[in-house]
């Protein structure tokens, strides 16, 4: 059984990681441990590189705390231009897989508050009245009328980031 450390306590991220690992390695093939670790970047990262650095830092910090695991996984959400997206970073002892998620264009009224220094989650919670929306459907769920959620978009990116771990060509 694979021991997988999720460098997050966010239920949407954990759900995406668990589902993707089960789809790739088989149902019941993984035990998931969830831990809170620092990203080393601002609460609301801006740009692809800062966001990717946050995910990489979370993986490194998770590895330091739980070095006996088989996989360490982090998902870091960020703002790039007028959109929100995330980076997924997965490592085992010998390699790394990374993938960027789909992007969601954000309305100007939301972007204005984020650019003033607020994190997207709290801005969206105020806008929607949904407490801790970032731990639930997120802006993605709201602006896609529930057709997608944070977890569903993260899930795709986790599947992509897992590609090097089950394909010999890598």
Swiss-Prot record:
<comment type="function">
    <text>Phosphatase that hydrolyzes non-canonical purine nucleotides such as XTP and ITP to their respective diphosphate derivatives. Probably excludes non-canonical purines from DNA/RNA precursor pool, thus preventing their incorporation into DNA/RNA and avoiding chromosomal lesions.</text>
</comment>
<feature type="binding site">
    <location>
        <begin position="8"/>
        <end position="13"/>
    </location>
    <ligand>
        <name>substrate</name>
    </ligand>
</feature>
<protein>
    <recommendedName>
        <fullName>Inosine/xanthosine triphosphatase</fullName>
        <ecNumber>3.6.1.73</ecNumber>
    </recommendedName>
</protein>
<dbReference type="InterPro" id="IPR026533">
    <property type="entry name" value="NTPase/PRRC1"/>
</dbReference>
<comment type="subunit">
    <text>Homodimer.</text>
</comment>
<dbReference type="InterPro" id="IPR002786">
    <property type="entry name" value="Non_canon_purine_NTPase"/>
</dbReference>
<keyword id="KW-0378">Hydrolase</keyword>
<feature type="binding site">
    <location>
        <begin position="68"/>
        <end position="69"/>
    </location>
    <ligand>
        <name>substrate</name>
    </ligand>
</feature>
<dbReference type="Pfam" id="PF01931">
    <property type="entry name" value="NTPase_I-T"/>
</dbReference>
<keyword id="KW-0479">Metal-binding</keyword>
<keyword id="KW-0460">Magnesium</keyword>
<dbReference type="InterPro" id="IPR029001">
    <property type="entry name" value="ITPase-like_fam"/>
</dbReference>
<comment type="similarity">
    <text>Belongs to the YjjX NTPase family.</text>
</comment>
<dbReference type="InterPro" id="IPR050299">
    <property type="entry name" value="YjjX_NTPase"/>
</dbReference>
<dbReference type="GO" id="GO:0046872">
    <property type="term" value="F:metal ion binding"/>
</dbReference>
<feature type="binding site">
    <location>
        <position position="68"/>
    </location>
    <ligand>
        <name>Mg(2+)</name>
    </ligand>
</feature>
<feature type="binding site">
    <location>
        <position position="38"/>
    </location>
    <ligand>
        <name>Mg(2+)</name>
    </ligand>
</feature>
<keyword id="KW-0464">Manganese</keyword>
<dbReference type="GO" id="GO:0103023">
    <property type="term" value="F:ITPase activity"/>
</dbReference>
<dbReference type="GO" id="GO:0000166">
    <property type="term" value="F:nucleotide binding"/>
</dbReference>
<dbReference type="GO" id="GO:0009117">
    <property type="term" value="P:nucleotide metabolic process"/>
</dbReference>
<dbReference type="GO" id="GO:0017111">
    <property type="term" value="F:ribonucleoside triphosphate phosphatase activity"/>
</dbReference>
<keyword id="KW-0546">Nucleotide metabolism</keyword>
<keyword id="KW-0547">Nucleotide-binding</keyword>
<dbReference type="GO" id="GO:0006772">
    <property type="term" value="P:thiamine metabolic process"/>
</dbReference>
